[in-house]
């Protein structure tokens, strides 16, 4: 029988090796990553195992399935070998409990440059010595690495130059490379060390992927392995069972093989030792490398990875490896460009915290650094204990899971295919296996949570609609460092509120997490109540921070600049946000501004009554928030320069009450103009709304002053002013002084605000009805409204004559239509309306006039006493110049004064201190005893006359009786003009 013909190709083996090297360089079919130093090297496990016994043992130790056991004698028979090899070559059935082998193999203490040369030699069988072989240190380093890896051709390089690596065993490497690489030909006993070791390893349970290199104990999670390694203090001569079984020892191995000469298993080097110190009764763990102290041992272990070679977190996009996971996360952001830092005011996202901080300082007027630190006595800053994060850290998209997982530290059970494969829409709903139920220690969360913690999450606790999609879903976490809660009491939803932000990509409808939102909607305010019970709430001090929007209020579609992302897609700015921080508690996010205030346009089709009620609620809430910020002024670290109400421009008042003529078409007038239009006083015709009821109609009248109001809320607020401010204020707020407008139901907090508000009433009637002037006469005590005379509008004019001239000037007062000089002129009031069309009942007329300032003509009016020269002003001085000697008369007996709102409203001054008013009006200044003159009334109280009013028209002076002592001197108003008024 002729021998069989054979076909050989000497170039086949080099060609296959060349193709494998090309695949390695391109990253094709690489199933393991080798980490040497800070560099990653992709490779093929089969090539590494065929080239180096070190890699063969290491990869067998981390194989997912053990080799079949060998029964019988010390050496296997050829039949057993063939069966074992055939069974190992065939793919075994996948076990549900077997975990995938680790794809990362770390080489501690191996320099990256030397390992790169060795890996190139494995794949190409060529090695270019550094420096042409003249660099002895580099050659010795490669030789030491070759001895450690067991590569026979590299063991002789630089022999004796390095003693830190044990010599590789020569008996385990065959001379024929085809026997080890291709698996053909006779095998030596040394090649069965790994198989024998695997046979002695118990394989009743699945192999755990994280074994301890010292004691051999395996763990499921790498964190548990790190905790165990810190406590494991066995000797360095103890061999671990990670790579070899317990049967491999000095005498249990094959003949001629020393256990100490075997390559070291893959593991971690010993980390730096730590020092325990006790300082002030507290235990501190000090790092031996950098002497940094930590409170807990786990923090020190986490820090020790920086000093050791435990770089187990390789970048998924480049060749860098990091010691800590957060270092890798911060690095990978620059590859992916993810914007994880989200502003809680405008929901804009940024790549880094620095960009977010710059955005909040520039566009919202908020400095986050002031919230996280406080000043020290020596002028520095120290971190706060209870800091408020004004941002949310969103999870990474690459690491985000569509549903919450429940890890109990045991091998994970096989997940049902229905959780991995989305169900098509055409398939009918069928019961699917769900993960085990989550523990329920408290109320269910209203946002979809993930398995990893998040530093900040918004939990909607008071609004049921916010749970179903009001907040950004998918940004929460199972554990939150700072929780921002909606703890305001629930109120009926408004139709014109700003729409909720678009939710971020969340779970599929088939995931069980989507069903976790529905029970939160029924929780309602109970969620916030349950959360508040365990947080030790207290009514303490508050800090209010107001953030302005990113864009302007024009609503022209202009995109905000400088936000960092493509914000030009937003056609209108997001709503404003005000945050009230209670000391020691969470933040309360209040969005007070409705959509129509930020997006000018036409009104929607809602009812007029609802819109009025909404704006009244918003106005009341704005006033309460401003009171709260003023009451806690001493606690406020900073005040933003933005206010909710826009400032009126200089030309905004030219349009009158309507205010629509000067605005471009398609834009609504400002909010304060709309309120003035809707109020609709009685002299302006009522505007019919969509509901048929006039906006200007006032149905509720006050029983005390018969003033009409459009709503019951305004009437109650007005009645509280009559009762002396007996309304109950909120707990923890200071009582504020109320200043009620006499023309409408507006209640101001300060006198200056009331003065500015009063100017609006004067503005909306340009050249309108003259201001009625009420004049009371001494002789007409019993007169009623029929004796009231209306005069030309004027700001204020107080003039008088002596008491004897009261009856003599009656005829002159009737003949002239100007103001009477013998009676006080009280201007600025308005006759209040009366229900039922009846006449208004006036208060009783005073028996004596107010402080009267009179003057008479005298020939010698130019003389005066020295030291009394002064200046009253150009207009007032010229008016009083021709009046001659003047005199101020006060009455000694006190008389009943009516200084309520009716009298005070007549004066154009702001009487903030009412207690001093009756005392000033009852001051006595006898005529005959030569007392000092009373200063002019504005000089006494320091009240400023309304600057916008027209200067008063001086009436023609009437002859007054001459004072007995007024022949050669100046009295009365002249002395007042000269010296008493500054």
Swiss-Prot record:
The gene is Zbtb4. Keywords: Chromosome, Coiled coil, DNA-binding, Isopeptide bond, Metal-binding, Nucleus, Phosphoprotein, Repeat, Repressor, Transcription, Transcription regulation, Ubl conjugation, Zinc, Zinc-finger. The modification Phosphoserine is found at residue 367. PANTHER family: AGAP004733-PA, TRANSCRIPTIONAL REGULATOR KAISO. The keyword Zinc applies. One of its GO terms (cellular component) is nuclear body. Transcriptional repressor with bimodal DNA-binding specificity. Represses transcription in a methyl-CpG-dependent manner. Binds with a higher affinity to methylated CpG dinucleotides in the consensus sequence 5'-CGCG-3' but can also bind to the non-methylated consensus sequence 5'-CTGCNA-3' also known as the consensus kaiso binding site (KBS). Can also bind specifically to a single methyl-CpG pair and can bind hemimethylated DNA but with a lower affinity compared to methylated DNA. Plays a role in postnatal myogenesis, may be involved in the regulation of satellite cells self-renewal. Residues 591-600, 628-637 have a biased composition (Basic and acidic residues). SMART domains: BTB, ZnF_C2H2. Residues 71-103, 234-255, 404-578, 591-700, 715-738, 759-839, 854-880 are annotated as: Disordered. Residues 242-255, 467-477, 552-565 have a biased composition (Gly residues). A zinc finger (C2H2-type) spans 210-232, 285-307, 313-335, 341-364, 700-722, 739-761. GO terms for molecular function: DNA-binding transcription repressor activity, RNA polymerase II-specific; methyl-CpG binding; methyl-CpNpG binding; protein homodimerization activity; protein kinase binding; RNA polymerase II transcription regulatory region sequence-specific DNA binding; zinc ion binding. This is Zinc finger and BTB domain-containing protein 4. There is a cross-link at residues 40, 548, 590 (Glycyl lysine isopeptide (Lys-Gly) (interchain with G-Cter in SUMO2)). Residues 74-89, 478-488, 507-529, 799-820 have a biased composition (Low complexity). Phosphorylated by HIPK2. This phosphorylation reduces stability and triggers ZBTB4 protein degradation in response to DNA damage. It is found in: Nucleus; Chromosome. Interacts with HIPK2. Interacts with CBFA2T3. Interacts with ZBTB38. Expressed in adult and aged myogenic satellite cells.
């Amino acid at each position: 029988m002729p021998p069989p013909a054979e076909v050989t190709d000497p170039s086949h083996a080099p060609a296959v090796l060349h193709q494998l090297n090309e695949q390695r360089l391109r990253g094709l079919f690489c199933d393991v990553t080798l980490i040497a130093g800070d560099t990653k090297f992709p490779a093929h496990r089969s090539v590494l195992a065929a080239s180096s016994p070190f890699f063969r043992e290491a990869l067998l130790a981390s194989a997912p399935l053990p080799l079949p056991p060998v029964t019988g004698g010390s050496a296997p028979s050829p039949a057993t070998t063939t069966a074992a090899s055939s069974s190992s070559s065939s793919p075994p059935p996948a076990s549900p409990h077997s975990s995938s082998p680790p794809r990362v193999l770390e080489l501690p203490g191996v320099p990256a440059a030397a390992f790169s040369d060795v890996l190139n030699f494995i794949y190409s069988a060529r090695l270019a010595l550094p420096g042409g072989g003249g660099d002895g240190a580099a050659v010795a380093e490669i030789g030491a690495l070759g001895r450690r890896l067991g590569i026979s051709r590299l063991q002789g390089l630089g022999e004796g130059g390095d003693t830190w690596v044990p010599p590789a065993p020569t008996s385990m490497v065959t001379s024929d490379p085809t026997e080890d690489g291709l698996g053909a030909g006779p095998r030596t006993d040394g090649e069965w060390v790994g198989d024998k070791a695997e046979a002695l390893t118990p394989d009743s349970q699945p192999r755990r992927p994280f074994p301890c290199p010292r004691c051999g104990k395996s763990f499921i999670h790498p964190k548990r392995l790190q905790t165990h390694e810190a406590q494991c203090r066995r000797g360095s001569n103890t061999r671990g069972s990670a790579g070899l079984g317990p049967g491999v020892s000095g005498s249990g191995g094959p003949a001629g093989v020393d256990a100490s000469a075997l390559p070291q298993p893959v593991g971690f080097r010993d980390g730096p030792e730590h020092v325990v110190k006790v300082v002030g009764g507290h235990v501190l763990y000090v790092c031996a490398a950098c002497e940094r102290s930590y409170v807990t041992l786990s923090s020190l272990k986490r820090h020790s990875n920086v000093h050791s070679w435990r770089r187990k977190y390789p970048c998924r996009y480049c060749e860098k490896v990091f010691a800590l996971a957060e270092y890798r996360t911060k690095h990978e952001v620059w590859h992916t460009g993810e914007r994880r830092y989200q502003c809680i005011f405008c929901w804009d996202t940024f790549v880094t915290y620095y960009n977010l901080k710059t955005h909040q300082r520039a566009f919202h007027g908020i400095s986050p650094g002031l919230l996280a630190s406080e000043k020290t006595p020596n002028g520095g800053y120290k971190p706060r204990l209870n800091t408020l994060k004004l941002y949310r850290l969103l999870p990474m998209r690459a690491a985000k899971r569509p549903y919450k997982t429940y890890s109990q530290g045991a091998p994970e059970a096989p997940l049902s295919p229905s959780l991995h494969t989305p169900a098509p829409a055409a398939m009918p709903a069928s019961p699917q296996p769900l993960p085990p139920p989550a523990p329920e220690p408290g109320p269910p969360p209203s946002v979809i949570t993930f398995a990893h913690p998040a530093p900040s999450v918004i939990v909607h606790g008071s609004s049921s609609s916010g749970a179903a999609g009001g907040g950004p879903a998918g940004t929460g976490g199972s554990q939150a460092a700072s929780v921002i809660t909606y703890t305001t009491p629930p109120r009926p939803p408004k139709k014109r509120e700003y729409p909720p932000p678009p939710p971020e990509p969340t779970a599929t409808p088939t995931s069980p997490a989507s069903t976790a939102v529905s029970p939160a909607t029924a929780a309602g305010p109970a969620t916030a109540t349950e959360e508040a019970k365990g947080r030790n709430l207290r009514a303490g001090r508050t800090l209010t921070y107001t953030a302005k929007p990113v864009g302007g209020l024009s609503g022209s579609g202009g995109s905000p600049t400088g936000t960092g992302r493509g914000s030009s897609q937003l056609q209108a700015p997001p709503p404003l946000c005000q945050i009230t921080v209670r000391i020691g508690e969470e933040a309360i996010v209040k969005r007070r501004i409705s959509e129509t205030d930020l997006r000018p346009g036409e009104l929607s089709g809602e009812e007029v009554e609802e819109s009025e009620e909404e704006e009244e609620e918003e106005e009341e809430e704005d006033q309460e928030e401003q009171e709260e910020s003023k009451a806690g002024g001493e606690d406020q670290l900073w005040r933003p320069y933005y206010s909710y109400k826009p400032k009126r421009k200089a030309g905004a008042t030219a349009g009158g009450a309507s205010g629509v003529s000067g605005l471009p078409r398609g834009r609504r007038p400002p909010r304060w103009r709309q309120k003035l239009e809707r109020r609709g006083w009685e002299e302006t015709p009522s505007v019919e709304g969509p509901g048929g009821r006039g906006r200007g109609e006032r149905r509720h009248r006050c029983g005390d002053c018969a003033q009409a109001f459009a709503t019951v809320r305004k009437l109650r607020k007005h009645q509280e002013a009559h009762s002396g401010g007996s309304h109950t204020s909120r707990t923890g707020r200071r009582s504020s002084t109320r200043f009620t407008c006499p023309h409408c139901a507006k209640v101001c907090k300060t006198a200056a605000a009331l003065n500015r508000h009063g100017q609006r009433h004067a503005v909306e009637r340009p050249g309108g009805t003259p201001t009625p002037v009420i004049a009371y006469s001494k002789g007409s005590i019993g007169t009623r409204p029929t004796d009231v005379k209306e005069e030309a509008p004027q700001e204020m004019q107080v003039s008088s004559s002596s008491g004897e001239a009261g009856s003599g000037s009656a005829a002159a007062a009737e003949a002239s239509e100007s103001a009477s000089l013998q009676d006080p002129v009280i201007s600025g009031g308005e006759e209040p309306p009366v229900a039922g069309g009846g006449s208004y009942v006036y208060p009783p007329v005073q028996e004596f006039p107010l402080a009267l300032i009179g003057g008479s003509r005298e020939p010698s009016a130019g003389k005066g006493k020295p030291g009394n020269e002064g200046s009253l002003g150009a207009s007032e001085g010229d008016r009083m110049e021709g009046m001659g000697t003047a005199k101020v008369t006060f009455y000694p007996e006190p008389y009943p004064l009516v200084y309520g709102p009716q009298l005070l409203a007549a004066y154009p001054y702001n009487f903030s201190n009412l207690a001093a008013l009756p005392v000033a009006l009852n001051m006595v200044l006898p005529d005959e005893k030569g007392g000092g003159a009373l200063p002019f009334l504005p000089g006494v109280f320091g009240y400023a006359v309304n600057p916008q009013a027209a200067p008063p028209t001086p009436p023609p002076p009437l002859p007054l009786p001459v004072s007995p002592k007024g022949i050669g001197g100046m009295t009365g108003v002249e002395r007042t003009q000269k010296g008493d008024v500054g």
